[in-house]
Amino acid sequence: MPFHNPFIKDGQIKFPDGSSIVAHVERWAKVRGDKLAYRFLDFSTERDGVPRDLTWAQFSARNRAVAARLQQVTQPGDRVAILCPQNLDYLVAFFGALYAGRIAVPLFDPSEPGHVGRLHAVLDNCHPSAILTTTEAAEGVRKFFRTRPANQRPRVIAVDAVPDDVASTWVNPDEPDETTIAYLQYTSGSTRIPTGVQITHLNLATNVVQVIEALEGEEGDRGLSWLPFFHDMGLITALLAPMIGHYFTFMTPAAFVRRPERWIRELARKEGDTGGTISVAPNFAFDHAAARGVPKPGSPPLDLSNVKAVLNGSEPISAATVRRFNEAFGPFGFPPKAIKPSYGLAEATLFVSTTPSAEEPKIITVDRDQLNSGRIVEVDADSPKAVAQASAGKVGIAEWAVIVDAESATELPDGQVGEIWISGQNMGTGYWGKPEESVATFQNILKSRTNPSHAEGATDDATWVRTGDYGAFYDGDLYITGRVKDLVIIDGRNHYPQDLEYSAQEASKAIRTGYVAAFSVPANQLPDEVFENAHSGIKRDPDDTSEQLVIVAERAPGAHKLDIGPITDDIRAAIAVRHGVTVRDVLLTAAGAIPRTSSGKIGRRACRAAYLDGSLRAGKVANDFPDATD
């Protein structure tokens, strides 16, 4: 039956006193206590996975027990860091902190490869009073903290070791007001020191309602994810369940990467299903699943006709990716309209916009030169200057997005590219411990609006979040054109990195699809190898600070034995023809060398840093999502 959303009135989202995600879990524990709430598919011991389940009543009891223990050893307002492996205990730890009236900090087990530096940086910022982990991971966590000063070693609690009967001492904390922080969502950026977005209980509840409304959620819809819970997209997807009241299934990122068919099979219709399946995936996952997740002949039947939505909230999805995924899974009933290009960011809790539920992904082709000059001008797909742009759909209810000339803080008309500013009660309240950055990002005032305006409905004194993303409205839809900080400027001309990267990967089959990074570096910082290469067309000049284009690309499987000369020549030629710019260095690397964020995005700034310090050329592997098999 259709999900009746009692919190939406006259285009606004309003909650009764005492309403929170915690209150919703307690409600389901009373009225659906024996029904499944969360299922973890554990592939660590069985190839086909072992389901590990919690009912709503069990989930409530575990949450109250952990909360009671936290109330014994911490104070209101204390931060509680979650350093659990991705399993049921992680969700109990997160909710336990909320139940206790403490500030949750969703992080990760220190044994996660490549994340130790980030973990230290986050802990230095939030200074937690307690750590929640598991019995199995506790020794590794304590060992990690032994590397820190004695006064920075918080109490470590294994959530699975807290007895259920401790729940009897739980004290329901004071009702949160609109400023009460629920958790800190640390951004997934690759190079800068992580910043913790302060997400209030009101922000969280609002954004969950916005997602459900945008997807036309129904009772009986179930959620599915393999994304890490320390990432906003993974966390919010898991939190849809307490609002709808149906169950959520998850696995680890490694389980998906190693065998993407696991995710595909969980998307499929299950016995007893009364609704659809809602999932999320970054852009690379669609190609990965299409390449390696299609059932082999003789496999059990697969019915994907029930898939309601798979949100893609990372970099814009390409027409080729959509085509490959639909060709791979259309024969199994996958609905083309289920792929939902979306837009979101931690500063908005997560969700800003998505493709309407009844629509297929909308991908238009625009003139490259016009786009680089700040305008959306549609052209035929076969135009030599055509570049594809995927719509991010419509902005959610009770939130607003405007395209702004950042220098003058004025709204730009449709069709013009500017910085995306957003507003609504799902916006976080700032960055933890960073007041100046908080004001600069979260406390902006829109000085003038167009007529009509995309800010219609927002108050005149509303504050706006600067997203750092370029975008435009066109034909009623929001389009994301790129990150402000990632824009490549060569000889005074703008180039979007994803456009350059697409041209590079299309130039040669020896390049791994989706594993290309484009960025610029000053000429006098290029490595010696560039000046020794006649193809670079540049001579060393210590005073030359002009920005020069660099392409880093991972080799496709089986391409490591090929002569790199023709490959790099093809890339240089393709970019020269399509973009009118010279590539000074094409660096081909082994698989896994290009850094990625926790959501699977190319970490361009981290890649640039590794290029400049020489670690990329030295063969360092930095990928968070290794292309492993088991």
From Swiss-Prot:
Keywords: ATP-binding, Fatty acid metabolism, Ligase, Lipid metabolism, Nucleotide-binding. Optimum pH is 7.5. ATP binds at T187, S188, G189, S190, T191, R192, S342, A346, D469, R483. GO terms for cellular component: plasma membrane. SUPFAM superfamilies: Acetyl-CoA synthetase-like. Pathway: Lipid metabolism; mycolic acid biosynthesis. The acyl-AMP ligase activity is inhibited by the alkylphosphate ester of AMP, adenosine 50-dodecylphosphate (AMPC12). Also inhibited by eicosyl-AMP (AMPC20). Coiled coil: none annotated. CDD domains: FAAL. Its EC number is 6.2.1.20. The keyword NADP does not apply. It catalyses: a long-chain fatty acid + holo-[ACP] + ATP = a long-chain fatty acyl-[ACP] + AMP + diphosphate; decanoate + ATP + H(+) = decanoyl-AMP + diphosphate; dodecanoate + ATP + H(+) = dodecanoyl-AMP + diphosphate; tetradecanoate + ATP + H(+) = tetradecanoyl-AMP + diphosphate. GO terms for biological process: fatty acid biosynthetic process. It is an enzyme of class 6 (ligase). It comes from the Bacteria. PANTHER family: DISCO-INTERACTING PROTEIN 2 (PTHR22754:SF32), DISCO-INTERACTING PROTEIN 2 DIP2 -RELATED (PTHR22754). Consists of two globular domains connected by a flexible linker. ATP binds in a cleft at the interface between the N- and C-terminal domains and its binding induces significant local conformational changes. Involved in the biosynthesis of mycolic acids. Catalyzes the activation of long-chain fatty acids as acyl-adenylates (acyl-AMP), which are then transferred to the phosphopantetheine arm of the polyketide synthase Pks13 for further chain extension. Can use decanoate (C10), dodecanoate (C12) and tetradecanoate (C14). Monomer. Belongs to the ATP-dependent AMP-binding enzyme family. This is Long-chain-fatty-acid--AMP ligase FadD32. It comes from Mycolicibacterium smegmatis (strain ATCC 700084 / mc(2)155). The lineage of its organism: Bacteria, Bacillati, Actinomycetota, Actinomycetes, Mycobacteriales.
